[in-house]
């Protein structure tokens, strides 16, 4: 009990992206530039979808949810990084650290399952166009979105509770700019074997959406290649290209971080986390709007309304 009380009274020290202060100053500027872009870009996507009745369909409903997840995902960590840098502090409370870890895991899972739902939506639209409105009904969309949030939160809870039960024996220095599960497990002086097993189980849960995405796109392209039409092929690539780009960005960075043994983790890996915590959520609005004529038109309409009013 004494050890548990000591842990709950412990303040962690977030070492930042690197151990070099000059490099952390550079990352501060990067975060300071990226965060407003993330908020503005994703908020514009949500507003454009809400304002344009032509975008009131499953594909854009799922995209709006992805933008919402990305806004919250970035807001869990980046404001704390910016505030600590400005205040000259690196501290975060034990409770604050656990909350940060909980939301990061929950939102990462919600993000991955939303990406899977978007791939499923495209597969149904291209492979079963006559049954699309029946399969992707408003009720189905709500269930897919609700399911992604429920799975995310239920996946994050056991990891958070297990981490809360660990002792840290005064070890305070977290080798990252936020409370990630891997540096916390390496920091603990308790037996973390069960925690590690649960973490790998969580990685498995995280991998399921990727499997769904692969199956969905195999179905999409097998359908498209059966139709001897260059126009159909081009349309499929335009429709799915943006989503596939986001999937590669998201899973490429997270797999490089978590699909490996805990012992291989090093402080240098914090640089990788910048990619999926800050860069990917900022790029998503540009990726989805640059190659999507309907989204471009909706954004232009939104801006013209704001200017005229």
Swiss-Prot record:
Residues annotated as transmembrane: 26-49, 58-79, 101-120, 140-158, 196-218, 236-258, 271-290
Keyword annotations from UniProtKB, A to Z: Cell membrane, Disulfide bond, G-protein coupled receptor, Glycoprotein, Membrane, Olfaction, Receptor, Sensory transduction, Transducer, Transmembrane, Transmembrane helix
Compartment(s) where it occurs, according to its Swiss-Prot or TrEMBL record: Cell membrane
Membrane-topology descriptor: Multi-pass membrane protein
Domain of life of the source: Eukaryota
PANTHER family documented for this protein: OLFACTORY RECEPTOR
UniProt protein name: Olfactory receptor 1A2
């Amino acid at each position: 009990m004494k050890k548990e009380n000591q842990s709950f009274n412990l303040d962690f020290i977030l070492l930042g992206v690197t151990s070099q202060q000059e490099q952390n100053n550079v990352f501060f500027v990067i975060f300071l530039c990226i965060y407003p872009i993330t908020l503005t870009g994703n908020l514009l996507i949500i507003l454009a979808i809400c304002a344009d009745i032509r975008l009131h369909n499953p594909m854009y409903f799922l995209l709006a949810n992805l933008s919402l997840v990305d806004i919250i995902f970035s807001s869990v960590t980046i404001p704390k990084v910016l505030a600590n840098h400005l205040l000259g502090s690196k501290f975060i409370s034990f409770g604050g650290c656990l909350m940060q870890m909980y939301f990061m895991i929950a939102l990462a899972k919600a993000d991955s399952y939303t990406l899977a739902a978007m791939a499923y939506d495209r597969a149904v639209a291209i492979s079963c166009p006559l049954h699309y409105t029946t399969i992707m009904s408003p009720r189905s969309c709500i269930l897919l979105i609700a399911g992604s949030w429920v799975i995310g939160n239920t996946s994050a809870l056991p990891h958070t509770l297990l981490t809360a039960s660990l002792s840290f024996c005064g070890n305070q220095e977290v080798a990252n700019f936020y409370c990630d599960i891997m540096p916390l497990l390496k920091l603990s002086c308790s037996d973390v074997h069960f925690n590690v097993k649960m973490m790998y189980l969580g990685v498995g849960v995280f991998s399921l959406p990727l499997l769904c995405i692969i199956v969905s796109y195999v179905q999409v392209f097998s359908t498209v290649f059966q139709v001897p039409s260059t126009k159909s092929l081009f349309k499929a690539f335009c429709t799915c290209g943006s989503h596939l780009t986001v999937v590669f960005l998201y899973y490429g960075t997270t797999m490089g971080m978590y699909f490996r043994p805990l012992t291989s983790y090093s402080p240098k890996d914090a640089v990788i986390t910048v990619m999926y915590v800050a860069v990917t959520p900022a790029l998503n609005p540009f990726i989805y709007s640059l190659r999507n004529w309907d989204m471009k038109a909706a954004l232009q309409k939104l801006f013209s309304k704001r200017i005229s009013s």
